[in-house]
């Protein structure tokens, strides 16, 4: 489903908490970039949409990678917590920041254990009138080695 002519496309932020994710961040970025570009091309979301990485006090090079990705790729941005505060607090920090910029916010784990193709269905449900869309995975049969 795309927006009708004359209606403003909505800004999507995908909030991705990150803790010591340097091993997976490059692949995560590649896949999320591809998904976001597809959604923009299909006129499901605004060009102002972003993926927001939230560094949760990582001890490895995660924050450095987020900074480099954000400099190279317009679709990506990042924030860094002063120290490790835990997944839920990193998620909350990202959501609280994203709400200032986005019409739609989706959370996703950095290891891509969530199916990024579900984003399309979630956005469709939003445009159908849902205020909240919640996804629960029923099986892990399709997981690649990268996600396990």
Regions found by a protein language model. Name each.
Residues 148:
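Active-site Tyr-X1-5-Lys
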Residues 3-144:
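Structured catalytic core of nucleotide-sugar glycosyltransferases
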């Amino acid at each position: 489903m795309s927006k009708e002519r004359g209606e403003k496309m909505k800004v999507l932020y995908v909030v991705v908490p990150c803790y010591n994710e340097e091993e997976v961040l490059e692949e995560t970025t590649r896949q999320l970039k591809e998904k976001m570009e597809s959604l923009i091309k299909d006129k499901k979301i605004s060009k102002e949409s972003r993926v927001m990485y939230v560094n949760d006090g990582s001890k490895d090079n995660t924050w450095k990678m987020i900074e480099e990705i954000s400099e190279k790729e317009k679709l990506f941005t990042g924030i860094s917590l002063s120290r490790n505060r835990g997944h839920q607090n990193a998620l909350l920090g990202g959501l609280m920041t994203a709400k200032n910029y986005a019409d739609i916010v989706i959370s996703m784990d950095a290891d891509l254990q969530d199916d990024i193709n579900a984003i399309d269905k979630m956005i469709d449900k939003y445009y159908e009138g849902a205020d909240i869309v919640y996804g629960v995975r029923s099986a892990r049969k399709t997981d690649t080695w990268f996600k396990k």
